[in-house]
Amino acid sequence: MTDFIEQFGVWGGFGIAVLQILAFAVVLLISLAFLLLMDRKVWAAVQMRKGPNVVGAFGLLQSFADFFKFVFKEIVVPAGADRSLYLLAPLITLILAFVTWAVVPAAPGWVIADLNVGILYLFAMSSLGVYGIIIGGWASNSKYPFLGALRSAAQMVSYEVSIGFIIVTVLLFAGSMNLSEIIEMQGGGFWNWNVLSFHAWPMPMFLVMIPMAVIFFISALAETNRPPFDLPEAESELVAGYQVEYSSTPYLLFMVGEYLNIVLMCAMTAILFFGGWNDPFGLDVSGWPYLASHAWYFFWFAAKIVFFFFMFAMVKALVPRYRYDQLMRLGWKIFLPISLAAVALVGAAVVYGPQG
């Protein structure tokens, strides 16, 4: 950082940092537009429909048309609502969803803030996301949004515990909380990815990591309020939950924040278990030109994110919604004991194993 400031000056360094953040945000939002289209196309295909196919070739511009539709609608604040909190809630959700991405590396060196405690920062920021939903549900001054907000708070807190323990198992193996180092540890081919790796300890690593990857993926569905765990916005019970009273741009901000969190969970699944930017073949690209090698890394990272987003979309289309008691039972009585046992097992292996 000191060298960076000495080279460009304080204001020059600040300007470059702002440009990097803006470029990253623009790429992320454009990618999100096409992922939204994919989500709708997958759902339509499962239901034997065509899906969006009018705006642009094959409906490719549908998300951009929806963006302008939301932006140019009137913002209607319900009578009796707390106006300032009502408008602040979607902003909180969106900002927290964006800043969480600051520590996610898309390729070696392609990260806004390469923190040594990146996992801790990410977990802290994602945990704060529930505040936007709670504030929005309470400020709307309506029973359906309030019930949806209460459900969301209980659901996100319940599954954050399991996600936290699963992340601890990965940290014990990696010996680092830096996301780039966790990815680099998995280089050299798919047989070194955490989910498939043997590694030198008393039992094959994949025997623990495969169940942890499955539980992490299911917990990510609950953490992001996606089907079959979309109880906070259940249409058949709460109309649309905490979003009932929102329209126009505030509703758009909620939706973008929600999908940014979904893509983040896809990225975390790829980073923690499936090698991040590492390709499955173990190809050595260190001798390639800088742009070519980093484009190769970025391609594989993006491909893994798209694959897991596709899995999110398929679950949404195929799996019926859980009841609230089933949701809580799954989180507290099944996932929590399994993830806690995995932490104890991996901790014992790290301390008392051949490498301990």
Curated annotation (Swiss-Prot):
The keyword Nucleotide-binding does not apply. It is a multi-pass membrane protein. PANTHER family: NADH DEHYDROGENASE SUBUNIT 1 (PTHR11432), NADH-UBIQUINONE OXIDOREDUCTASE CHAIN 1 (PTHR11432:SF3). This is NADH-quinone oxidoreductase subunit H. Its EC number is 7.1.1.-. Keywords: Cell inner membrane, Cell membrane, Membrane, NAD, Quinone, Translocase, Transmembrane, Transmembrane helix, Ubiquinone. It is found in: Cell inner membrane. The chain crosses the membrane at residues 16-36, 52-72, 85-105, 117-137, 163-183, 201-221, 254-274, 295-315, 334-354. Belongs to the complex I subunit 1 family. GO terms for biological process: aerobic respiration. NDH-1 shuttles electrons from NADH, via FMN and iron-sulfur (Fe-S) centers, to quinones in the respiratory chain. The immediate electron acceptor for the enzyme in this species is believed to be ubiquinone. Couples the redox reaction to proton translocation (for every two electrons transferred, four hydrogen ions are translocated across the cytoplasmic membrane), and thus conserves the redox energy in a proton gradient. This subunit may bind ubiquinone. It catalyses: a quinone + NADH + 5 H(+)(in) = a quinol + NAD(+) + 4 H(+)(out). It is an enzyme of class 7 (translocase). HAMAP family: NDH1_NuoH. One of its GO terms (cellular component) is plasma membrane. NDH-1 is composed of 14 different subunits. Subunits NuoA, H, J, K, L, M, N constitute the membrane sector of the complex. Signal peptide: none annotated. The keyword Transmembrane helix applies. The lineage of its organism: Bacteria, Pseudomonadati, Pseudomonadota, Alphaproteobacteria, Maricaulales. One of its GO terms (molecular function) is quinone binding.
